Amino acid sequence: MASSVGNVADSTEPTKRMLSFQGLAELAHREYQAGDFEAAERHCMQLWRQEPDNTGVLLLLSSIHFQCRRLDRSAHFSTLAIKQNPLLAEAYSNLGNVYKERGQLQEAIEHYRHALRLKPDFIDGYINLAAALVAAGDMEGAVQAYVSALQYNPDLYCVRSDLGNLLKALGRLEEAKACYLKAIETQPNFAVAWSNLGCVFNAQGEIWLAIHHFEKAVTLDPNFLDAYINLGNVLKEARIFDRAVAAYLRALSLSPNHAVVHGNLACVYYEQGLIDLAIDTYRRAIELQPHFPDAYCNLANALKEKGSVAEAEDCYNTALRLCPTHADSLNNLANIKREQGNIEEAVRLYRKALEVFPEFAAAHSNLASVLQQQGKLQEALMHYKEAIRISPTFADAYSNMGNTLKEMQDVQGALQCYTRAIQINPAFADAHSNLASIHKDSGNIPEAIASYRTALKLKPDFPDAYCNLAHCLQIVCDWTDYDERMKKLVSIVADQLEKNRLPSVHPHHSMLYPLSHGFRKAIAERHGNLCLDKINVLHKPPYEHPKDLKLSDGRLRVGYVSSDFGNHPTSHLMQSIPGMHNPDKFEVFCYALSPDDGTNFRVKVMAEANHFIDLSQIPCNGKAADRIHQDGIHILVNMNGYTKGARNELFALRPAPIQAMWLGYPGTSGALFMDYIITDQETSPAEVAEQYSEKLAYMPHTFFIGDHANMFPHLKKKAVIDFKSNGHIYDNRIVLNGIDLKAFLDSLPDVKIVKMKCPDGGDNADSSNTALNMPVIPMNTIAEAVIEMINRGQIQITINGFSISNGLATTQINNKAATGEEVPRTIIVTTRSQYGLPEDAIVYCNFNQLYKIDPSTLQMWANILKRVPNSVLWLLRFPAVGEPNIQQYAQNMGLPQNRIIFSPVAPKEEHVRRGQLADVCLDTPLCNGHTTGMDVLWAGTPMVTMPGETLASRVAASQLTCLGCLELIAKNRQEYEDIAVKLGTDLEYLKKIRGKVWKQRISSPLFNTKQYTMELERLYLQMWEHYAAGNKPDHMIKPVEVTESA
């Protein structure tokens, strides 16, 4: 605030006394300017006693008393000056200063304005008026006051800088910038303007320009404390920590007891990972300023990082005692409560932080994250959007919102969020990892691998990224450093389990790695506990369950829960089961977790179940569970486990008295809320029951089932063309299938019936033989027409009124037949030439996804191919990017590239049908073909397997045991190779085994859905009777076998 000291008026006394008076006046002025107010007052009083009416002396006395905060005395002398000269603008201005200091702003403003009316070019008056208007909240008026001052003197660089400050405060950054630049133009060495300009650039996000201007300010004024602090702050934000430390240390050399600078310096130490130094520096800041909530909050952050959570919690609470509305402390304390599992308190604190500070982006994001974990996705999304609205460059919020959108199945939205997060912060490892997960789920594996590698480069200790990268590399069969990778992955899981953290390996992937059974079970258990955490916040009381069947008219109500009622392998397996239950004893409910996909698979289940409920329309797990409970379900069946689309929270709420795992997930749930796992003796031997959290409930033959007889009845029979006419009949070179096959064959001349002998499916497979009749079409004009259709790539021809179609063209003829939704109505021709398979070689095949192959499996297959020289291995491009890796590893093992033939993934019907062309299927021991095993067996192709220790590695053995083909089950690697080699070199033996599989698929229980349903019903009744008797779940490993006529 400018005080006007005035000029000493001319004296009428003689010259000698006048000189003495003038000299004393100048001395008083100099003392005033130097801040020696005591001496200035003493000399002024001498002057006043000599000339009591001298307005210059009166103004100087007014200013001296004002500086000494003797406001009444200051006002007194200003008033005396006005009495002497009512037009003295400076006196009114000085009086205005007194009023302003007393808080009487309107009186101050009136006096300043009066001074300016008296003296329109009074610069100090404008400056004082501007300050008073700012204090009164009239910012625009203050701007005009500064502008008026500058109109009278454009070279007032200090005033122009002050105007810039005001414009900056109003958010008018470009105008502020212009002011500072003009001030610098007027006075290039004006350090304050350089510093202020740096603040503008910082506010505009021009970090490097800000740094440059702050550095210029401290160069011009090496003792400019605020500029050093500003420089340190912007360097801290730019993460240039060493230079930030230097700036703060220089500031402390100028002001050693500056608590805020100590606090900021501690923040830099914290970011540098110098936690102990940060803690010490925060403590120094608190020592200097005990009522410093920011320092307590930041100290708590450092203590938490060090693991001193209890002490950190105390510090947050201290900060809140000092300032109950300290939003950062509320937010950070909420984070601790969340990590402690006290979710309700965390939510309360986040909401309190937002109540205090609605524009708190981090609190919005954190609250959203908790809401997402609770399954409240829409509310979470709302808070993420708020966080981003408040802070458009909040990369974490974008990344986390992407996670929510991903969970809501909005893949494009999630992709955009992750991409934006990375644009904002290219070094954001979590966002790269999240982006990778979207690519992975979308099947863009190379992009996923690249993003995971970027994440790990940015953050080497990143278990989630490492384990997901390992899975991606498994998918494409990239086995570089395979053994080392497996060791590291196991050690990551061990460390996470020891620290009670959620493992980075997903339960569904755990079967692929050399983990112990205990680890696999613990991984599943952690995921089960997550479901419990989500439902705990609902505060739902336990459901009461019936102990009898009175309310259901004596019928057992079974509820099947799945996200896969549609075009999905699970429906391909079980779609007929709901409609085959005995309606007198069972009432069937199917609960869909996914919307209608418009396929016949969905239509069939909807039509044949007694009740079909689309729970995808009830996103709230509590309400969905209520619906299940209201339906009075006795046995609730989980067909998802931890596969995509699961809602295990429904089971965690226990809406049914008995809950069982079945079919859709190849492992234990690890969850206390699942009572049984429906399995069989071969898949889950009783001696490994400890692998499962559930009790084992055995089916008498196999827990696996396939609806192939219903979906693909046209493959029950086949005919072949004797294309070589050399007396050797091949059953899998040119194959014809069709519902009308017999009628078509009857219309042809010269069709021969060849009897193929095959062993029975008893315990002793070689004890007796039965004959199978296989129609053979000789090479004639009709056969030639069929072969010409294939060679020319024609879609379809007509022979004797029958439509004969090219097996590669099913999607063009009838797409629903291609997907397995309808039975093809044409005669379909399938040939080895369609897939580039050699006519005169043994074809081994495997139609699994490539992730099921590991180095030891490929080595076994290479050994087999070497021992069977005239043989090839037929695999799928599943995915295509895995093909070059497999080929390269095979070449390293001594196999030429032409020994492995890849085909694209095919529609379901073609996929099953073309399996007839292979001679032998080689199963993957790591994780068997489950649905694909059923597919290849329905095609009549023998499958060699070697059961391991996991459920996923024993399913094929269970299928083969049910089929009666024990000779195809190996006990070890050598036996696996020997069985495959015998099939490839002993063609008579191969023919017998192929005949056996062809026969047994019809006569064994493996594809008998009616018998399977009856056995499943018997198991359900066992479970119910056990429960109704008041017993806890127990193993049911003595299944009651039933026959179809039972």
Swiss-Prot record:
Domain comment in the entry: The TPR repeat domain is required for substrate binding and oligomerization.
Protein family membership: Belongs to the glycosyltransferase 41 family. O-GlcNAc transferase subfamily.
Subunit: Monomer; may exist in different oligomerization states in cells. Homotrimer, oligomerizes via TPR repeats 6 and 7. Trimerization is not necessary for activity in vitro, however it increases affinity for UDP-GlcNAc. Component of a THAP1/THAP3-HCFC1-OGT complex. Component of the NSL complex at least composed of MOF/KAT8, KANSL1, KANSL2, KANSL3, MCRS1, PHF20, OGT1/OGT, WDR5 and HCFC1. Found in a complex with KIF5B, RHOT1, RHOT2 and TRAK1. Found in a complex composed of at least SINHCAF, SIN3A, HDAC1, SAP30, RBBP4, OGT and TET1.
EC top class named in words: transferase
Gene Ontology MF terms: phosphatidylinositol-3,4,5-trisphosphate binding; protein O-acetylglucosaminyltransferase activity
Protein name: UDP-N-acetylglucosamine--peptide N-acetylglucosaminyltransferase 110 kDa subunit
Membrane-spanning ranges: none
Positions occupied by motif DFP motif: 464-466
Residues where N-acetylalanine is found: A2
Pathway: Protein modification; protein glycosylation
TPR repeat residue intervals: 21-54, 89-122, 123-156, 157-190, 191-224, 225-258, 259-292, 293-326, 327-360, 361-394, 395-428, 429-462, 463-473
Domain of life: Eukaryota
EC number assigned by the record: 2.4.1.255
Gene that produces this protein: OGT
Species whose genome carries this gene: Oryctolagus cuniculus (Rabbit)
